[in-house]
Regions:
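N-terminal, intrinsically disordered, polar/charged segments of Gram-positive cell-envelope systems
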Residues: 29-79
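Alpha-helix initiation/capping motif
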Residues: 20-33, 51, 156, 212, ...
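Transmembrane and membrane-interface helices of multi-pass
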Residues: 1-42, 105
Length: 465
């Protein structure tokens, strides 16, 4: 397998040794290890690998942290969308440069007529970055940085303050919709643990005679999904798209499938001519065509809400799971993004309410801000200290984002290895304070998950009732 990349690089996720050691991604882990080694290592990681021992200093830190006084305040956005339906759309690989008026007109219009967080960053954690975003947005925490544990293995942890639990307390039904099965990333188990009523996978329906379920349009066109999405009066729907997934080639995958559909539609045919030859397309062109399919799904969603007279009382939150790191040709990213540091993780995030609230937020945000921002907008009472991120619409919000190699960015400076590598130098004491704060957030995140601390908090609360 070779040697691992000790530092995060653009291609770390491809390194066989990194894949094997992290064991974060089912598919890639199987590819590098083979079925027998995969089975053995999966058993070891899940059941045998030594668990972390209890450290008294860790517990004291958590005790002090979670006994701090509440500091959040109301603002002009508090309760703005109270009692609205909520649809969260997690976009697969829709990088910033893919949202254009030409390629993705629906997303482009929504983004520019909503609350647009223009300095937003997703978390790159090697394989499994899609589920890492699901984990962050639903729980307010991210995959640990100081030790290796897959996000989807925290299904035995208690998350009483997750998005689903808090919205269900307000009388909402909460469901998730995706292409893939409930077994993949143990989504069925995890979503139930987070408080969801159901996780629905198109593949699980068992009604498809082909693989057309990989097209995002099916998330809305499928009659069963459509019925489940809108059958209740107050609902939260978490929709995870798929079509803009690798590979980006006309030789196989979703790009090839879409080109076939385009040709059949344009020529009013049911089958391709025997002499048909697929055109050659660059990875970028395929990515744009696949993104257009996701945009078509969004168009169908808005049409469905309009037909059901739900558009005015439904808020849609949209963000991307990760930048398009699955491209083979990095020069594509070099054209559109900063690629020599973790700012490559810059991705879209916006909140749309039928073109009624247009605002640009330039402060730095990340997936960790999504949940507390939603809770405030819906006027749902929550304890701000129970999350790593804070409400990005708060009057006193000054954001920063940290990455898996402990580098961080606050909108003015990018710090790597404790020193400023981008932006103007700042006072050494201020830099020391900021470095300390980032490490404190990571420590809080990792220890809370390690010790399943919310289970202890909930047990104490139940004893006082």
């Amino acid at each position: 397998l070779g040697t691992p990349n000790e530092e995060l690089t653009w291609s770390t996720w491809r390194n066989p040794r990194n894949i094997y050691m992290s064991f974060n991604d089912n598919n890639k882990s199987m590819m590098v290890s083979g079925i027998y080694e995969y089975t053995a290592r999966n058993f070891y990681v899940t059941f045998i690998k030594a668990k972390k021992t209890t450290n008294e200093e860790d517990l004291i830190f958590l005790e002090e942290e979670y006994n701090k006084e509440e500091t959040k305040e109301t603002n002009k956005y508090t309760g703005k969308y109270k009692d609205n339906n909520l649809i969260i759309v997690q976009l697969e690989g829709i990088d910033n440069w893919l949202i254009t008026e030409e390629d993705t007109p629906t997303l482009y219009k929504m983004m520019n007529n909503g609350i647009n967080f223009t300095n937003h960053y997703s978390y790159y954690n090697g394989g499994g970055s899609t589920f890492n975003s699901e984990f962050a947005v639903n729980t307010g925490f991210i995959t640990p940085l100081s030790y290796t544990q897959n996000a989807y293995t925290f299904n035995k942890n208690t998350f009483p303050y997750s998005l689903a639990h808090l919205f269900k307390n307000e009388g909402y039904t909460v469901n998730a919709f995706h292409m893939n099965t409930s077994e993949y990333y143990s989504r069925g188990v995890n979503y139930k643990n987070w408080g969801y009523d159901n996780y629905y996978g198109l593949v699980d329906l068992g009604t498809y005679k082909d693989d057309s379920y990989v097209l995002d349009r099916e998330l809305i066109l499928n009659e069963t999904f459509k019925e489940k999405m809108f059958e209740n009066e107050k609902f939260v729907n978490y929709i995870i798209t798929y079509t803009n997934h690798m590979p980006f080639t006309t030789e196989k995958g979703n790009c090839r499938k879409l080109l076939k559909l385009d040709y059949l539609s344009e020529n009013n045919l049911e089958e391709l001519p025997k002499d048909y030859v697929y055109p050659e397309m660059t990875e970028e062109s395929c990515a744009r065509r696949q993104a257009k399919e996701t945009d078509y799904m969004m168009e169908l969603l808005l049409n469905e809400l309009t037909e059901r007279n739900l558009l005015d009382n439904t808020t849609i939150v949209v963000f991307t799971d990760h930048y398009l790191y699955t491209l083979s040709d990095q020069t594509i990213l070099d054209k559109y993004k900063e690629t020599d540091n973790n700012l490559i993780n810059h991705t879209p995030f916006f909140i749309w309410h039928n073109n009624k609230d247009k605002k640009t937020i330039k402060e730095v945000t990340s997936q960790l801000n999504v949940l507390p921002t939603i809770l405030n907008l819906y006027g749902i009472d929550y304890t701000s200290n129970y999350y790593i991120g804070t409400d990005a619409l708060d009057n006193n919000y000054h954001g920063s984002v940290f990455f898996s190699d402990y580098s961080w960015y606050d909108g003015s400076i990018y710090v790597d290895g404790g020193v400023v590598t981008k932006g103007k130098e700042i006072d050494s004491l201020l830099l020391e304070d900021k470095n300390y704060y980032i490490n404190y957030l990571i420590k809080k995140n990792d220890l809370t998950l390690k010790y399943n601390y919310f289970k202890q908090i909930k047990e104490r609360q139940n004893k006082t009732i």
